[in-house]
């Protein structure tokens, strides 16, 4: 796959994602998005959540098809709609990631507001989530049986799911927050020291790095979560070495304490 000029990538995004009453994404946002989409296509992350503006499924399909027409992407990416959110997904890499999740490679941190401190859970303690992951794997396996030249689309109905937990899994985080929906969407992370992990890569010369991951874990739980985080970093570095579109993978962390944490 070739890398078109930045001007062509920006034009493709503004032409498809800024139609009608939607404001055109600025140049930096367009390049940021193209880099994240390419990272999904190259297997560095299973999905990216589209949050640049209110563009819907049809606009995103047009955008991805334009990138294919520029020789920037191969066919195979998928748009997954969950609630009012759209994710651009690699069915192949998402299947691999979810299959590993069922084997216990992802940890869960219960931050329900009904408890005084965050606590670690395993997937076996979340049977409903385990069943949902298996269903999503089946859905993507069906997609992989025949890749069409266009950009496919599907919708997951999410009336009783914890979207925070589900998005954490789909976006490839090694640790995902969860909480009891029966107690509202509050959490017990207020003024709790959090270790924030950030992974980014270099792409276009003269442009800021492309963010791959940004997630946090309670600092008090860092020791029991260390193995999950180390395995995630090892896997990411392995995938990074297998591609040649990006350079300079950087993974860092810092501890922050916030008066409120929105999930």
UniProtKB/Swiss-Prot annotation:
Question: InterPro entries, alphabetically?
Answer: DUF4504
Please give the organism: Rattus norvegicus (Rat)
Q: What name has this protein been given in UniProt?
A: UPF0739 protein C1orf74 homolog
Give the family per the record: Belongs to the UPF0739 family.
Q: Which Pfam families match?
A: DUF4504 (PF14953)
What's the domain of life for this entry? Answer: Eukaryota
Organism phylogeny: Eukaryota, Metazoa, Chordata, Craniata, Vertebrata
């Amino acid at each position: 796959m070739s890398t078109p000029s930045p001007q062509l990538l920006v034009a493709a995004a503004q032409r498809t994602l800024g139609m009608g009453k939607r404001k055109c994404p600025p140049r930096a946002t367009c390049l940021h998005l193209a880099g994240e989409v390419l990272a999904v296509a190259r297997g560095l992350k299973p999905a990216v959540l589209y949050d640049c503006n209110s563009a819907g499924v049809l606009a995103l399909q047009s955008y991805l098809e334009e990138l294919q027409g520029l020789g920037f992407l191969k066919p195979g990416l998928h748009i997954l709609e969950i609630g009012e959110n759209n994710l651009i997904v690699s069915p192949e890499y998402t299947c691999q990631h979810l299959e590993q999740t069922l084997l216990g490679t992802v940890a869960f941190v219960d931050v329900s507001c009904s408890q005084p401190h965050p606590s670690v859970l395993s997937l076996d303690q979340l049977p409903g989530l385990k069943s949902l992951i298996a269903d999503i794997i089946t859905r993507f396996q069906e997609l992989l049986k025949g890749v069409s030249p266009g950009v496919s689309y599907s919708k997951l109905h999410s009336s009783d799911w914890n979207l925070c937990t589900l998005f954490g899994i789909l976006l490839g985080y090694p640790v995902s927050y969860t909480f009891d929906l029966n107690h509202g969407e509050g959490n017990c992370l207020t003024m709790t020291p959090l270790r924030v992990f950030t992974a980014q890569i270099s792409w276009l010369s003269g442009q800021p790095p492309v963010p791959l991951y940004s997630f946090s874990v309670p600092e008090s739980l860092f020791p029991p979560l260390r193995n999950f985080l180390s395995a995630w970093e090892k896997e990411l570095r392995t995938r990074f070495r297998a591609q040649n579109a990006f350079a300079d993978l950087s993974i860092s962390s810092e501890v922050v304490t916030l008066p409120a944490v929105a999930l």
